[in-house]
C-alpha cells in the first residue's frame, strides 16, 4: 500500500509524539529509555515541629548509610517560597527499579529505620511520597 507523502508525514509525526512505556506491574509504567528512579518524600510538620522533623530525617538518613547507601539528600523550606512547600523534603536517586526495590527491602528489614518512621509520624501533619522515572533528554 502506497501512502501519499502528507499522510505518511502525519503518521510519522503522530508516532513520534506518543511516548513509549514499559509496564512494571501493578499499573506502574516507566518510559522506555528511563535513566533512573527518583523517590521524594515531603514532610509537612505540625506547628512548631519543623526542626524536630529535620532532626529525625537526618537520623533516618544516617540509618540508611548503615544499612544500604546512599543516604539521599535532605532539603528544607526556602524562605522565599510561597508557603505551599514542605518543611523538609528528602530525595534519593536509584539506578533502576531493582535498586529501589532492594533499598525498600533494606528499610523494611531495619528496626532502626522503623523506629525513625514511628517517631516521624508523631511530628508531621502531612506526608507525601512521590516516585518518578528519570526520562532521558
Question: Which sequence ranges carry the predicted segments?
Answer:
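Short amphipathic alpha-helical segments
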Residues: 49-74, 108
Amino acid at each position: 500500500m502506497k501512502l501519499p507523502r502528507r499522510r505518511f508525514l502525519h503518521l510519522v509525526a503522530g508516532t513520534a509524539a506518543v511516548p513509549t512505556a514499559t509496564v512494571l506491574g501493578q499499573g506502574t509504567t516507566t518510559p522506555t529509555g528511563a535513566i533512573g528512579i527518583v523517590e521524594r518524600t515531603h514532610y509537612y510538620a505540625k506547628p512548631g515541629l519543623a526542626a524536630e522533623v529535620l532532626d529525625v530525617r537526618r537520623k533516618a538518613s544516617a540509618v540508611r548509610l548503615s544499612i544500604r547507601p546512599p543516604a539521599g539528600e535532605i532539603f528544607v523550606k526556602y524562605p522565599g517560597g510561597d508557603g505551599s512547600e514542605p518543611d523538609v523534603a528528602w530525595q534519593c536517586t536509584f539506578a533502576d527499579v531493582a535498586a529501589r526495590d532492594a533499598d525498600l527491602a533494606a528499610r523494611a528489614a531495619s528496626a532502626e529505620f522503623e523506629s525513625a518512621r514511628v517517631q516521624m509520624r508523631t511530628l508531621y501533619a502531612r506526608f507525601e511520597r512521590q516516585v518518578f522515572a528519570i526520562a532521558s533528554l
